[in-house]
Amino acid sequence: MYEWLNALPKAELHLHLEGTLEPELLFALAERNRIALPWNDVETLRKAYAFNNLQEFLDLYYAGADVLRTEQDFYDLTWAYLQKCKAQNVVHVEPFFDPQTHTDRGIPFEVVLAGIRAALQDGEKLLGIRHGLILSFLRHLSEEQAQKTLDQALPFRDAFIAVGLDSSEVGHPPSKFQRVFDRARSEGFLTVAHAGEEGPPEYIWEALDLLKVERIDHGVRAFEDERLMRRLIDEQIPLTVCPLSNTKLCVFDDMSQHTILDMLERGVKVTVNSDDPAYFGGYVTENFHALQQSLGMTEEQARRLAQNSLDARLVK
């Protein structure tokens, strides 16, 4: 069934470009930029990809991102991801990038954006993959820092379709960024936010009511709140679910416990995505395949999940 799933036309709506940095490219960029790495080789780095929680993953993720220095680096990162999309019949992408991960290291905002944007434009021209780029704020940093990042983004307003919110969830509720999101919306941005991954269902309520998001990234803990489930179904609010990420970060102990198909059958508009595929062992097709292998997902369910992803695009 893998080949059939691979050929299914689909969109990817929850993908961090920095999370597509495969070990081989990481080492190549480190060599190009003359950066010493704490790992001896690709295999040693791959062995480090064993996480017990979100924070352990983030620590490695930010360490890996340090090799991204130049416009060409960001182009190469994005282009490698788009080639993977072409191979898996992902026809539309709405990736996140985290400018603060780079500007806090002294990399100018416009350098990061120029490389990513050029690759996305080439992806549309040369590979036929449509896109919309989402600027994501790091929630473990302050509201003031998010406001500064929004200031940096405004001269490039036409480069983005939306703002988002990611990084360490627990202790950083969506309400912390309500004023930033209000301002972003007043500037014409759509909004999305990570909520209900490690954080409680209350964070999903906040994202909907305070940040006024178009869709929820992750959202799997909505299953614990029946009233919230009813709202998601009634309003057809999309959830961008990332199955392999959820098991790798121990949101679910095992894929057999994942609730995505239960949510689908109840009428929630769930989609399948890869989140940080270089770190979690699979791109979109591998995530679909894991659901088929562990949960017995049928072809009909796969078609619905793929159609949900196309329907839930911010750029139609």
Curated annotation (Swiss-Prot):
The record marks 218 as: Important for catalytic activity. Keywords: Hydrolase, Metal-binding, Nucleotide metabolism, Zinc. GO terms for cellular component: cytosol. This is Adenine deaminase. Its EC number is 3.5.4.2. It catalyses: adenine + H2O + H(+) = hypoxanthine + NH4(+). InterPro entries: A_deaminase_dom, ADE, Ado/ade_deaminase, Metal_Hydrolase. It holds the Pfam family A_deaminase. Binds 1 zinc ion per subunit. Substrate binds at residue 276. Zn(2+) binds at residues 14, 16, 194, 275. It comes from the Bacteria. GO terms for molecular function: adenine deaminase activity; zinc ion binding. Belongs to the metallo-dependent hydrolases superfamily. Adenosine and AMP deaminases family. Adenine deaminase type 2 subfamily. It comes from Pseudomonas aeruginosa (strain UCBPP-PA14). SUPFAM superfamilies: Metallo-dependent hydrolases. GO terms for biological process: adenine catabolic process; hypoxanthine salvage; nucleotide metabolic process. Its cofactor is Zn(2+). Catalyzes the hydrolytic deamination of adenine to hypoxanthine. Plays an important role in the purine salvage pathway and in nitrogen catabolism. The active site is at residue 197.
